[in-house]
């Protein structure tokens, strides 16, 4: 087995609770995924430069896309913040993983 590095990516989780509608939530999630992509690219370059290892595994924080429910009912949270397994968010994460050559 070829050695590789893993990264526990630490980042702020932007809460979406106060956002007014699903469109605003989708915009916030998109910005978070932009940040994830840039962070992985930078981390991969740093790890390669200073250790010579290849970054292959990136672990993201729990609730990194939305933060957590704060008083919302299950139905409210489902409508406001949940993502679909075949939705744009997972597709984007797949694209990031493929482009960066990592597993998320």
Regions found by a protein language model. Give the residues of each.
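Hydrophobic structural segments
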Residues: 1-104
């Amino acid at each position: 087995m070829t050695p590789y590095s893993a990264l526990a990516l630490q980042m702020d989780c932007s809460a979406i609770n106060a956002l007014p509608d699903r469109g605003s939530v989708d915009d916030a999630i998109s910005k978070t995924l932009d940040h994830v992509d840039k962070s992985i690219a930078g981390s991969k370059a740093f790890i390669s430069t200073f250790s010579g290892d290849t970054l292959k595994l990136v672990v993201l924080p729990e609730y990194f896309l939305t933060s957590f429910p704060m008083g919302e009912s299950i139905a409210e949270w489902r409508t406001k913040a949940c993502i679909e397994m075949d939705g744009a968010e997972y597709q984007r994460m797949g694209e990031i993983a493929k482009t960066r050559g990592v597993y998320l």
